[in-house]
Amino acid sequence: MPDFIWEGNINTSICDQLLNYYDNCTIVPKLSFQASPTQEMVEGHFRGHGKTSTDLHLHMILSHNEGCLKYYFDELSRCITEYMEEYTWSGGMESVISDGFNIQRYQPGEGYTLWHYERTNGELSKRFLAWMTYLTDNPDGGTEWLHQEKYVAGKKG
């Protein structure tokens, strides 16, 4: 099935800087997060139990004082430009990077183990591009979309 899920990448040194920022950040608390556990049967296999992670909820304004965040948003802007060049129909649309974002850490055995899909409402129906960056290689992780029949490996950058 055709889709518009694009596998761009950012400079991996920025990934290392973001991990260092996550580990050493003292101005914003890290929050443990656990979604309500659920399981579903998909093609004869049980899939998922929810989401368990430790999240750092940040605001883009921090990028004015934190170099690694500025470099990250510069790289995201470059990726958006490349995406729009590949999917030329999107070029006339406004692109804005959301002010709020998360850096999430998954310990062994944790993760987001449910299918990715859009829960549409009035606000999300206007969004046509979402992004995610893996800060480390994770051979046991990745992101999978059921209806697009697409799997993206958890690869750094």
Spans of features found by a protein language model:
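Fe(II)/2-oxoglutarate oxygenase catalytic core
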Residues: 1-156
